[in-house]
Amino acid sequence: ARGSIAIFNRSYYEDVLVVQLHDLQKGYQMAPRVLEQDKDEFFAQRYRQIRHYEQYLYENSYRVVKIFLHVSKNEQKKRFLERIDNPAKNWKFSASDLAERAYFDDYQRLYEQVIDATAAKEAPWYALPADQKWYTRYLVSEIVVDALEHTSHNYPVLSTEAQQNLQDC
């Protein structure tokens, strides 16, 4: 709703990352005309759809800010080990994390491809170093504050009739 802030963790971008890496689109229940496209055409279409959707949001007064948190392979390993070794963090870890780690370099290539294909002036990407959490949080806060400062955030003005109705209450 207007005046609200929403945060999407991964969102529709998951559909062009994991799905593309593992060819999961082949199992989609979609019209043959869609599934018969070769893989490059299929995902080029997805990128175009994302750009158009974000353009639509922008043109309807929504602000889209996309942040990619880049964690190095060494830092990822360190965080995984912390999650395994620390019982308070066990819930954050899944064996599937290790399986996906084998694709680290492939994911980096796809992240770059997706960011390049979907970045726009109206819906920019911010690729941030994320090995040092304090610094990443600082950068994210700066981006969010800047976005909020450049957003119209005036309260709606009630019509004279609506104001009178309030007085009558």
Label the predicted regions.
Residues 1-42:
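Conserved nucleotide-sensing/catalytic segment adjacent to the nucleotide-binding pocket
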Residues 14-19, 73-80, 135-138:
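Switch/connector loops and helix/strand junctions flanking conserved nucleotide-binding motifs
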Residues 31-61, 95, 99-106, 110-114:
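Substrate-engagement module of ASCE P-loop NTPases
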Residues 103, 107-169:
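NTP-dependent small-molecule kinase module
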Residues 21-25, 81-86, 142-145:
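Short secondary-structure boundary/capping segments
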